[in-house]
Amino acid sequence: MVEPLLSGIVLGLIPITLAGLFVTAYLQYRRGDQLDL
């Protein structure tokens, strides 16, 4: 009964972590762009 709960938590966390990484990478890219200008 614990495995479905764990799989649900993992499936819920993966998109959140991916979104967080994408946002941080995008912010760093924009910051580098501004520094280059």
From Swiss-Prot:
Pfam families: PetG. Signal peptide: none annotated. GO terms for cellular component: chloroplast thylakoid membrane; cytochrome b6f complex. One of its GO terms (biological process) is cytochrome complex assembly. Keywords: Chloroplast, Electron transport, Membrane, Photosynthesis, Plastid, Thylakoid, Transmembrane, Transmembrane helix, Transport. It is a single-pass membrane protein. One of its GO terms (molecular function) is electron transporter, transferring electrons within cytochrome b6/f complex of photosystem II activity. The chain crosses the membrane at residues 5-25. It is found in: Plastid, Chloroplast thylakoid membrane. The 4 large subunits of the cytochrome b6-f complex are cytochrome b6, subunit IV (17 kDa polypeptide, PetD), cytochrome f and the Rieske protein, while the 4 small subunits are PetG, PetL, PetM and PetN. The complex functions as a dimer. Belongs to the PetG family. Component of the cytochrome b6-f complex, which mediates electron transfer between photosystem II (PSII) and photosystem I (PSI), cyclic electron flow around PSI, and state transitions. PetG is required for either the stability or assembly of the cytochrome b6-f complex. This is Cytochrome b6-f complex subunit 5. It comes from Zygnema circumcarinatum.
